[in-house]
């Protein structure tokens, strides 16, 4: 693709997606020329460009910039920094985006989020082409259909970028990848460019927050709510109130928070934030298995959810009642010890008990799921007693955060090649232990292999199904009360003393 044609296509795309208006065409061309370090261009008349062609158009401009020495390195980190600068030149200013969102929100909050989600893709902040590479499937289990995804949309760092990052002076701007200061930031080799990123202000429970989408989209309309201030994650009464206020304002979305302790929390504990979106997880579909009640809260329907983790579900017409009861449960859990069930509130002054909360609307009612968490470590389980155990690490050894708690496995990219190799070996009868790709999976695969007859047509489906069953085991590991008579009796002991 010729350079001038690529510029014309990019301008056509921006006009089509209403990133720029017809009156801004010349200005936009000049903004691109500046970013590309060009003195001029001659644009062809016809140059339509749809979303599916955008990656090729950007690639053509990046290849040309590298050939001319404008793009210094031709690796993914540097290419991402550069193509984000190009898209940033075509992205409306924050006030325009906020104005459009607020105007639509006054009509209907769903209209506002529909537009904002599409906009976040049109600017290439959410890279549709990379999200499409993620491998996804569902596995039926006793807990319902769990979602499994092998995440391929996060680019791997290249060695040159890692080396360059070591030589950079330390920077605390932006303070983290969630901070509002990311909006419009040019990025560097160890921090993504965000010139095409726009956030919208929201107020939840009287506090100033922002709404944005995750660039990696693990599920439909995967949004992030972030505190305006860079303050640590904190599960408390105000957190419950904010979650329920959010689903009051955006009833078509769920929202939840990662826990506020290491091991059982998410990857970012330093900046208070929630994750939500428009997706129905297996956990939401899971029924209440044991009805329970809390004195003084007869108007709140409560129960233990049929789920591999230990979840109390609360449903009520009034969100204030859920806030009161959730706070009471949290306060009780924070200080609760039951040595016979290996629940220790603290050791050596270090707290262990917390909650992963998820809020949603159930018809007109409000609902809170409270997943009880504990981050105790032991000599046998140094990464966490209620964390994936060592025999499951070949599939999942990372923290079990909010998204996994709800029933969606986010598995590492390495598994795409490894699981394919396992399937090949099961068909061919090859030695699983000799191949570096399959050695870590050998015990697991040899365990389920006798149950099946493998063919080239069915092997991958079987391996995926068994991977999903491992994820169910991973969630069972993270459950503080096991799904045994003893475990459920211990769960009820906690509930009765609340």
Regions found by a protein language model. Give the residues of each.
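Helical scaffold of the NTase/Pol beta-like nucleotidyltransferase catalytic core
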Residues: 196-198, 230-255
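Beta-rich nucleic-acid/ligand-interaction surfaces
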Residues: 262-270, 348-354
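Active-site microenvironments that recognize anionic phosphate/pyrophosphate groups
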Residues: 1-225, 229-232, 306-308, 323-326, ...
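Catalytic or ion-translocation cores adjacent to nucleophile or general acid/base/metal-coordination motifs
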Residues: 238, 247-267, 276-330, 334-337
């Amino acid at each position: 693709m010729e350079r001038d044609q690529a510029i014309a296509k990019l301008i056509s795309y921006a006009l089509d997606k209403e990133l720029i208006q017809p009156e801004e065409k010349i200005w936009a061309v000049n903004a691109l020329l500046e970013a590309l370090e060009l003195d001029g261009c001659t644009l062809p008349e016809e140059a339509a460009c749809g979303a599916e062609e955008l990656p090729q158009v950007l690639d053509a401009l990046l290849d040309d910039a590298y050939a001319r020495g404008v793009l210094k390195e031709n690796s993914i980190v540097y290419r991402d920094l550069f193509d984000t600068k190009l898209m940033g030149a075509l992205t409306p200013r924050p006030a325009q985006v906020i104005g459009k969102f607020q105007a639509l929100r006054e009509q209907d909050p769903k209209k506002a989020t529909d537009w904002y989600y599409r906009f976040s893709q049109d600017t290439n902040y959410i890279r549709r082409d990379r999200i499409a590479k993620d491998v996804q499937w569902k596995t039926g289990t006793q807990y319902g259909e769990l979602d499994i995804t092998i995440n391929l949309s996060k680019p791997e760092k290249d060695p040159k970028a890692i080396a360059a990052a070591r030589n950079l002076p330390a920077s605390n701007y932006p303070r983290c990848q969630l901070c509002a200061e990311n909006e419009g930031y040019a990025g560097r080799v160890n921090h993504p460019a965000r010139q095409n990123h726009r956030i919208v202000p929201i107020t939840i429970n009287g506090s100033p927050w922002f709404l944005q989408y995750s660039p990696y989209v693990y599920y439909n309309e995967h949004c992030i709510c972030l505190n305006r201030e860079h303050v640590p994650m904190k599960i408390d009464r105000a957190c419950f109130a904010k979650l329920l206020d959010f689903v009051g304002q955006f009833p078509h979305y769920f929202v939840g928070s990662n826990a506020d302790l290491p091991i059982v929390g998410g990857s970012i504990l330093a900046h208070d934030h929630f994750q939500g979106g428009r997706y129905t997880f297996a956990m939401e579909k899971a029924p209440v298995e044991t009805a329970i009640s809390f004195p003084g809260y007869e108007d709140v329907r409560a129960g233990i959810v049929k789920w591999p983790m230990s979840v109390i579900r609360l449903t009520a017409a009034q969100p204030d009642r859920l806030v009161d009861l959730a706070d009471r449960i949290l306060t009780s859990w924070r200080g609760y010890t039951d040595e016979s069930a290996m629940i220790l509130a603290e050791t050596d002054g270090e707290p262990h008990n917390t909650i992963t909360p998820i809020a949603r609307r159930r018809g007109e009612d409000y609902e809170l799921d409270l997943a009880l968490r504990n981050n105790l470590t032991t000599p046998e389980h140094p990464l966490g007693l209620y964390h994936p155990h060592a025999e499951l690490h070949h599939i999942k050894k990372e923290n079990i955060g909010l998204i996994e708690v709800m029933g969606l496995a986010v598995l590492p990219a390495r598994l795409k090649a490894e699981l394919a190799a396992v399937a090949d070996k099961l068909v061919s009868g090859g030695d699983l232990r000799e191949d570096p790709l399959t050695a870590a999976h050998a015990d697991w695969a040899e365990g389920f292999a006798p149950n099946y007859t493998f063919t080239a047509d069915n092997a991958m489906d079987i391996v995926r199904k068994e991977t999903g069953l491992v994820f169910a085991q991973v969630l069972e590991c993270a459950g503080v009360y096991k799904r045994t008579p003893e475990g459920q009796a211990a769960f009820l002991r906690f509930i009765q003393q609340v």
